[in-house]
Structures are given as C-alpha cells and as structure tokens.
C-alpha cells in the first residue's frame, strides 16, 4: 500500500480501485488543497477514476468553497463514488449538507465505520471502466 502525505491529508492507495483520504486534525480545507488531493490521485492512477473513502480528523472542516469544488462536475473526472466515514453527529450534519446541497454527480454514502464503507465501495467497482 502506497501513501502520500499532503499538508491537510494523507492519501492511501488501498488497491487498484480504492483510495482512502484522511483529512488531518484541526484543519480548514480549501479548494486548492482539494485539487492537490485530486492531482495526486490522477497522477498515481494515470487519469483512471477511483472509489474514494473519506475520513476526517477532529476539529477539521471544509470551507463552503472546498465542498463546492469537491462536488463540482470536474471532480467526477477523478472520483467514481465516495464513501464518507462520519465520526459524530456534527460531522454527519456537515456531510449531509455536502451531499444534499452540493449534489455531486456520483454515488455517495455515509458510514459509521471503515469496514461498512469498504463493503459498499466493493459494490461500486462496476463504475470504474477497465
């Protein structure tokens, strides 16, 4: 498993289809940092889409602009589906805003743990063209 450390997140390439991005504690994620994550994924996968599992550390949030950027049509070039691991009720509310307000054009589900998120991502592998 390969991992890449960026200023706001750690990106782990779990297998050829699944990437886990963990946003570090006490960060305010901005659009350029979301793009940096997308750039690392695109470079590693040579432009091939991935299934993305996302977890967020304590005290970390995304600016409204970063959420909008992460859900924009352009983001679908990198990500086929998202599994968001929610750590608490407040984070679940923020994740629901991301899904309902920004309406990314790809499947997104919220989960309470990594195992459930991974099981769901396994059912989404058909979204990635060989």
Outline where the language-model segments fall.
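Amphipathic, Lys/Arg-enriched alpha-helical "gate/interface" segment within cytosolic domains
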Residues: 1-130
């Amino acid at each position: 498993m390969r991992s890449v450390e960026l200023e706001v997140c750690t990106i782990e390439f779990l297998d050829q289809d699944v990437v886990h991005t963990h946003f570090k504690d006490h960060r305010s994620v901005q659009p350029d940092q979301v793009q940096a994550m997308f750039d690392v994924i695109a470079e590693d996968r040579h432009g091939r889409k991935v299934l993305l599992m996302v977890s967020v550390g304590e005290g970390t949030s995304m600016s409204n602009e970063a959420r909008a950027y992460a859900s924009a049509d352009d983001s679908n070039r990198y990500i086929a589906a998202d599994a968001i691991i929610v750590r608490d009720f407040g984070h679940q509310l923020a994740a629901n805003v991301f899904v309902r307000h920004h309406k990314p054009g790809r499947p997104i589900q919220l989960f309470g743990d990594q195992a459930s998120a991974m099981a769901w991502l396994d059912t989404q592998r058909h979204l990635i063209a060989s």
